[in-house]
Amino acid sequence: MMEMDGQQSAHGESYAYTSPYWAEFYDMWVEEIIGSAALTKDDDFFFNLLSPFLPNSTRVRGPLRVVDMATGTGRVIRGILQKMNSRAQGELPGDIQKELEIWGIDHSQAMINRAKGLLEDKMKPSTTIVWRTSAAANFVDENPELRNAVDLLIFAAGSIGHLTAHGERRKFLQQVVKALRITNPPQTPRSIAAISILKPDDGLQENCSEQHVAGKEVRFNAEMRKPSRQWPHLEYCKSETMTLKDKGILVNSFDLKIVETATGKLLSQEKYSWSLQVFSQTEWERELSDCGLSISQKVETGSETWYILHLANKKSLV
Ligand SMILES: C[S@@+](CC[C@H](N)C(=O)[O-])C[C@H]1O[C@@H](n2cnc3c(N)ncnc32)[C@H](O)[C@@H]1O
């Protein structure tokens, strides 16, 4: 099957998310930039997206199915499970947990491996997590079990900006329309896709569009040094990020050094990159409507604008 994947074709082996070192450093970097208080608020937000579906324990059409698109190191899934577990002490009937199936999908095997490692010891036998390495633009075609079978899809951290190939975002939205379960409100809650766009001055993906002049490099984030937990004898040193704007695409690149802590010896130094599409609200809302998705709500959180989407009446548009 032909895959459409802007990051893999633009960056190849230097694409940051293919590196197991970056996979570990990513979590430290996010915590530093976003802050642990804001990350905890995100967990509440993710759980609140799920809660309307929870009282519906008598399901006729299989489990309550959640897709975490571009799951990365599984931050969204960990947030949901932590909240589920704390509520489960009191309020949630056990059969609801058994019926919950969460899919973590990402095109990077390195990120999925880390997500699995972080989640394995937290999982209860009642939780089903399905991991898949698939590109966003093909995720239903590659996993046909998801067709008309997803109650909630979450695409966090503005990662939709990574769909930079021509037509890639539209192709992803068409997959979302195939995935969302056709429901019968008010008996069953309407299936939803929650997709976030980063606010322009967010630090996470150096997405400061106004500050960029075509062809001119801009520097973001100071150098960051952190010890590895996975490889305790090593430490990371990330350089500041260089950002170059070219035809509506921001290309971010940086060096990641791996240093032996005891001796200070430099073991490796790689240049990594990714790219992001500069967001245009008009274009985005036109694509949503062309693909058959309606906006139920827009929600502002700390650094993201969330679009809560449902199927427009005529699903046949795709
Ligand atoms: C900024 S991280 C977000 C990770 C996680 N969702 C979070 O909130 O922390 C971006 C993720 O998007 C993934 N990604 C980028 N483009 C993708 C694509 N076309 N298909 C699937 N995953 C993609 C990357 O591999 C990476 O794990």
Segments and roles (model prediction):
Residues 150-168:
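A short SAM/SAH-binding and catalytic strip from SAM-dependent methyltransferases
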Residues 191-283:
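SAM-dependent methyltransferase
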Residues 274-318:
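C-terminal lobe and adjacent flexible extensions of AdoMet/dcAdoMet transferase-like proteins
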Residues 2-65, 75, 79, 83:
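Conserved class I S-adenosyl-L-methionine
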Residues 142-152:
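A short acidic, Gly/Pro-enriched loop at the edge of an enzyme's catalytic core
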Residues 70-74:
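Class I SAM-dependent methyltransferase "Motif I" SAM/SAH-binding loop
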Residues 75-139:
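Class I SAM-dependent methyltransferase SAM/SAH-binding core
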Residues 170-189:
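A short glycine-rich, Lys/Arg-flanked "PGG" loop and its adjoining helix->strand segment in the class I
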